């Protein structure tokens, strides 16, 4: 028999003579196919089915010789199996003989002894086959009792077939349980929806009856009081009128009869009128004096018998940074105590400024191109113009989409799929859904869905549309984002993130309740947007009445049109005014410093108008804002006032709203933003845009499973989007902090789609839940990398979400119902086994807020670190997060507690909302609530059940991952940074300056075999350094001779 290498060489040599070419993969394919065939004719038939070989003559002879040469495994019976078969045969043979009636008892004893020895042997075998073989033993014993003679029946089956039958039975049973669970979820949703509607109708009727009854009772009780109040008001008014009449009458009499002698009666009447007038004046003066004294004296607080007001710290929830109330009080006191100099009319004088920057500090820009607009340039808006409030309808009519309303509605009516191209600010997002609503697309209970890639955009746009329609947010217009749903039964316009629309496919695969689906900001090519494209394309073929609108702000709409079977493109002119593009003469070494210098340079040299600066993330934005504020303080009154306003996703809502407020007179506003201001937000008043040319992008390495958020150059499409922000209200300027050559040669045309640089575990789980099994041939706009898709399938199989055939299991179906990462879902499901679902829900909620629990003010770093250390518990960072939330809950969810412990109240409140939603979903996935009562071992085991994929152990060279053997490091902020435990579990692996493990947990290696015996082997978890080495003394060179 030839060796595998020799056989492969022989096949390659023969292929030269048969086909005239030879290739290693072809040879391996032929050898593998021959090994799987049971006969030479079957091998020849398989080769003939490929339609690549002419199996006549030499080719057929080659196939026959290859089949004879290929080695095959001989079916060798295992010793244990042979012993079992012999024992079974002996047992059947003993049962078949009955010589004497008196020998029944001894025969039964023999049978019992043989059965007991057979049972002992079976205990040593694999536990997977135990149940089936016990059933076979019972069947055999029943046959032996019933039959007194006869030949032995052959019931033995090969081991491999036995194993396959067991696996197939378990798979079919799991599929039945999965389908039953899905049906229960659908029925529960249906019942809940019907009950809600019935309850709401009944409740509305009862509320109306109660209001009518209360109105009648209140009217009867309030009429006397209202009469008294009206009488008092009338008397006060009559008193003033009578007093005025009396004064006028006295003035007339004094003027007419001042020189005339009056009778005694007339003199008494005049004296009486004067006395009445004086008393009325004294009464009025006494009342005014009483009011004045009442405002200056102290009054005891009155008892409030109504509903008590909320605590002050909860009212100030969205007050920005912790301690905001204290800071405002200090500023008010300091402002009142400070002495100010200068004339009072100094503010009305026209200030005169001069360039305060040194010549070597300025940055030289070169004007290169101009983006043309479709309107004549007008004067920049002054502060007085910015303060003028236009009506909402006038604003709607001024948007670029308004003149094309009828044409757009006609195009939507004539085509099922329509691609809409229009720059940000043209009115696509806010106006088109309203046009459809006015046209009647929401009749008969239908709804309109509009997706947004960002949560901030979905919330702000929904609020704006509700304001324009004159309805309350949450009624006819609402939004739905992850862990927050602001909709009701009356909602017909739903703004949602694209991920939320994906989740609606689980309960409504055909989107039957929607008449129009609008995918907005499609040019951003987020992960969920690309998945939506493939799903909506299939739904549109199934539902011809469904309207699909794809809105994009870039010129790259041909890709979308081709994908949707050459759908028509409707273009809306967006840029109203021209924009001048300026490039630097030379590259800038530090773009952050260049941004600060350029902002001050624009501030002192350019006409009025606000500035928009694009930076990569929160850290850079805060650093730039601090540098700008510091330099403005040093320059003092040499420059005009400069308002520095940041905008990023984690910023509190009230601070985000400040960027939309009008700029005060005589000042200039500079907005420092991430790429969220490229397309998702439109800020009025922006004239100047500063573009460093960088952005943050998430990348994913499927071989190591590591995500990294790196600063990379932006694409040309993003650069053009940023420049377009300057031409919304007047002719603008865009200053790019890179050269024109870099723009032409170093920037990519478009941004790499997110589906090609991120993990696909959630996506694969969702598609499998929707019944889409052939992921390789799914209709992606841009297919993801093969390795990423393969790793996602491998992880889901390891987590138990998929079986060996790639089908969704019951656990996988439950995991798909939870809107979190698959590993986090598995951790929540495993918490039921370890009776710690209460604690696991808290850990999952805290892990969902993106490492933004603690904060470190630059002036209180030591205090913040000490406060963080006070939360440390033995075991790891997950228990620290659990401890933080538990103490916060014990304090009554107080914001003051967060301020004192340097914890971000906004993040904690979001974690509470996430936990409440996950707790509500536990009933949906049929997991009961339980608590471990402080037994953190069970909590750590439940976390290990979900994150056994992310493990590392300590070696002599540091930490290495168990499977990939990649060097990793504990993050310095971790509670285990200085302890260095032997085995670790981490939440995520992030590449920054090093490969850091974030949120680590100390575990034991035996737990991995307990929760994932299918993934780890005992040999992998052995500690090579724990073995004792033989004691041996080395010899010197002289001793060795």
UniProtKB/Swiss-Prot annotation:
Changing residue 552 to L: Dominant-negative mutant. Impairs pre-mRNA splicing activity. Fails to interact with any of viral RNA forms. It holds the Pfam family HA2_N. Expressed in the spleen, thyroid and testis. Also expressed in the brain and cerebellum. The modification Phosphothreonine is found at residue 712. Residues 409-573 form the Helicase ATP-binding domain. Residues 166-207 have a biased composition (Basic and acidic residues). Its EC number is 3.6.4.13. The modification Phosphoserine is found at residues 103, 106-107, 160. Belongs to the DEAD box helicase family. DEAH subfamily. DDX16/PRP8 sub-subfamily. Required for pre-mRNA splicing as a component of the spliceosome. Contributes to pre-mRNA splicing after spliceosome formation and prior to the first transesterification reaction. As a component of the minor spliceosome, involved in the splicing of U12-type introns in pre-mRNAs. Also plays a role in innate antiviral response by acting as a pattern recognition receptor sensing splicing signals in viral RNA. This is Pre-mRNA-splicing factor ATP-dependent RNA helicase DHX16. It comes from Homo sapiens (Human).
